[in-house]
Amino acid sequence: MAMTMTGEVQLPATREVVFAKLNDPEVLKACIPGCETLVMSSPTEFSAVAAVKIGPVKARFKGNVHLTDLDPPNGYKISGEGDGGVAGFAKGGASVTLTEKDGGTLLTYNVEAQIGGKLAQLGQRLVNGAAKKTADDFFKNFAANVSGTPAA
């Protein structure tokens, strides 16, 4: 099943600070919902394990992420894939763009992914809703981290 998602978030920091935090494994681990481990194996590669629950399906996804087209502090592209065992798989990519706006940084993202296995059988609406909630939670946590205030 194909999935796309776009969005933008206004962050209270410079592009340089936002870019650095987007590449900091400790910040990402703290902000990604369900993230159990996140290891930076090179400046452009991460491996992670995250627990995910979508409807009745729970899974631990193990995956790898690669950063390409790095253009600090303007953005980059992300590609990756994750294996959730019998629950299924996810693979895809995203572009992330950082622009100065209103004394801070506007982060714009565009995600394209393929999902298979039991997760794909749950239906587009449920999967898209869960993906949107996960993205919203990540950016709420990330915005709190960038601004130096604790996440709710």
Describe the residue ranges of each PLM region.
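A generic structural micro-feature
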Residues: 1, 40, 55-61, 86-90, ...
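Hydrophobic ligand-binding cavity/cleft-lining segments
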Residues: 1-45, 51-53, 141, 148-152
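Intrinsic-disorder/low-complexity, polar/charged segments enriched in Ser/Thr/Lys/Arg/Asp/Glu/Gln
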Residues: 2-8, 45-47, 60-62, 75, ...
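Hydrophobic/aromatic beta-strand elements that line small-molecule binding cavities or substrate pockets
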Residues: 7-9, 36, 62-69, 92-100
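Solvent-exposed residues in well-ordered beta-strands and their adjoining turns
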Residues: 10-14, 51-55, 68-71, 81, ...
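Glycine-rich portal/gate segments that line the openings of hydrophobic small-molecule binding cavities
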Residues: 39-81, 137
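Beta-strand/loop substructures that line and gate deep hydrophobic ligand-binding cavities in soluble
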Residues: 82-129
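A conserved amphipathic terminal alpha-helix motif
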Residues: 116-152
